[in-house]
Swiss-Prot record:
Binding site for L-serine: 237-239, 291, 390
Source organism: Hydrogenovibrio crunogenus (strain DSM 25203 / XCL-2) (Thiomicrospira crunogena)
Pathway where it operates: Aminoacyl-tRNA biosynthesis; selenocysteinyl-tRNA(Sec) biosynthesis; L-seryl-tRNA(Sec) from L-serine and tRNA(Sec): step 1/1
Claim: Aminoacyl-tRNA synthetase is one of the keywords in the record: yes
Pfam family, one: tRNA-synt_2b
Gene name of the encoded protein: serS
Enzyme Commission code(s) on record: 6.1.1.11
Quaternary structure, from the entry: Homodimer. The tRNA molecule binds across the dimer.
Protein name in UniProt: Serine--tRNA ligase
GO biological process: selenocysteine biosynthetic process; seryl-tRNA aminoacylation
Function: Catalyzes the attachment of serine to tRNA(Ser). Is also able to aminoacylate tRNA(Sec) with serine, to form the misacylated tRNA L-seryl-tRNA(Sec), which will be further converted into selenocysteinyl-tRNA(Sec).
Length: 428
């Protein structure tokens, strides 16, 4: 969430920056609501002062032996008016906060200005796409030919956009997950295990609610014994529960930066992606991801973004998978992000680079919603900066390994970095 003071004092500048994201801020509506809020605030203060004054007069009138009933009636009437004013003021404030909750973050000055993914800027490439001397297959054809992938079973059990992996392919996915976690913990990240179901406060804190509820899976509660008054949702990413570890917390500045990694399944409805990547593991309702989250001092967040991105890159480099780093433009960055790098891995089966990681600096946007703060000694608490990045999307990494390491006979050479996780096996 943006700073409400900034929205009140520099609304036109905010609107101009948001316009580069393709977001049109209704400044007239905000001005009107802010004017109403101020009017009700003044009226409430005036009624409060008047009631206090009349209340003091009751004591004096009583001491003088005067009839105090008229004063009591006036105070009661003022109390009713004050209650109405407070309700009106609260309603206006709630309307303002709902609007503010739907406003995306301001892009950082270094974020390229553009309208769509076509305007994203390549920062660097690593590795060279392999040239094959045989007709290559995509990951679905490779896996189905070996009996490792069963889409029909997944549709029978659940629906489309789910997968059943078998034998070596299931083991390879597990090996990738363990390899990623080990790489991150070796680099100083603390591994955490977190809930896969979260409440509305958690999703609001990281920016998924209220704007993106259609992308989430909400749990309907039917049991009579369930007396919980909180709706729960399946997590779309580990970013949500891990970052929310620090909701309503004040952290000692000396402990910063805090770095965490977690492996979780992720669940997304993929609303709006009808007809895209319907085949295989690229776009699923349920998928595995290893996530990295950092809580840092505001002065260090852009240095942290570079470090976070390089850590995600290190996984691809160890697996010797060609990739490129893209700086997302203002029209393509996520709702909560100020700056984002996407890592795109080369997929021979598609003859294209595809996203495999997104690394973002949210500055204080999430922290303001979360009330995630830090302080030095007894100083006043300050909002921290939050960052997160995929390290990596496990299913897409599995796709990249299968397609880049395929052999003419349909076998798969195991990347050197993974062999110790598969008992030394070199060929699948």
């Amino acid at each position: 969430m943006l700073d409400s003071k900034l929205l009140r004092t520099d609304l036109e500048t905010v609107a101009a920056k948001l316009k580069t994201r393709g977001f049109v801020l209704d400044t007239a509506q905000i001005d009107e609501l802010e004017a109403k809020r101020k009017d009700w605030q003044v009226k409430t203060q005036e009624l409060q002062a008047e009631r206090n004054s009349r209340s003091k007069g009751i004591g004096k009138a009583k001491a003088a032996g005067e009839d105090i009933q008229p004063l009591l009636d006036e105070v009661a009437n003022l109390g009713d008016q004050l209650e109405e004013a407070k309700h009106a003021s609260d309603a206006i404030q709630a309307e303002i906060e709902l609007i503010y909750a739907g406003i995306p973050n301001l892009p950082h000055d270094s974020t390229p200005v553009g309208n769509s993914e076509d305007d994203n800027v390549e920062v660097r490439q690593w590795g060279t796409p392999k040239t094959f001397d045989f007709d290559i297959k995509d990951h679905v054809d490779l896996a189905e030919a070996r009996g490792w992938y069963d889409n029909d079973a997944a549709v029978k059990i659940a629906s489309s956009r789910f997968s059943v992996l078998k034998g070596p392919m299931a083991k390879l996915q597990r090996a990738l997950t363990q390899f990623m976690l080990d790489s991150h913990t070796d680099a100083g990240y603390e591994e955490v295990y977190v809930p896969f179901l979260v409440n509305q406060d958690s999703l609001h804190g990281t920016g998924q609610l209220p704007k993106f509820e259609a992308d989430l899976y909400k749990i309907d509660k039917h049991e009579e014994h369930d007396t919980s008054d909180r709706d729960l949702y399946l997590i779309p990413t580990a970013e949500v529960p891990v970052t929310n570890l620090f909701r309503d917390e004040i952290i000692d500045e000396d402990t910063l930066p805090l770095k965490f990694t977690a492996h979780t399944p992720c669940f997304r409805s993929e609303a709006g992606s009808y007809g895209r990547d319907t085949k295989g593991l690229i776009r699923q309702h349920q998928f595995e991801k290893v996530e990295m989250v950092q809580i840092v001092h505001p002065d260090q967040s852009y240095e942290a973004l570079e470090s976070l991105t390089q850590q995600a890159e290190s996984i691809l480099q160890k697996l010797e998978l060609p990739y490129r780093v893209m700086s997302l433009c203002t029209g393509d960055i996520g709702f909560s992000a100020a700056k984002t790098y996407d890592l795109e891995v080369w997929l021979p089966g598609q003859q294209a680079y595809r996203e495999i990681s997104s690394c973002s600096n949210f500055e204080d946007f999430q922290a303001r919603r979360l009330k995630a703060r830090f302080r030095k000694g007894q100083d006043k608490p300050q909002l921290a900066h939050t960052l997160n990045g995929s390290g990596l999307a496990v299913g897409r990494t599995l796709v990249a390994v299968l397609e880049n390491y395929q052999n003419a006979d349909g076998s798969i050479t195991v990347p050197t970095a993974l062999r110790s996780y598969l008992g030394g096996v070199e060929i699948l």
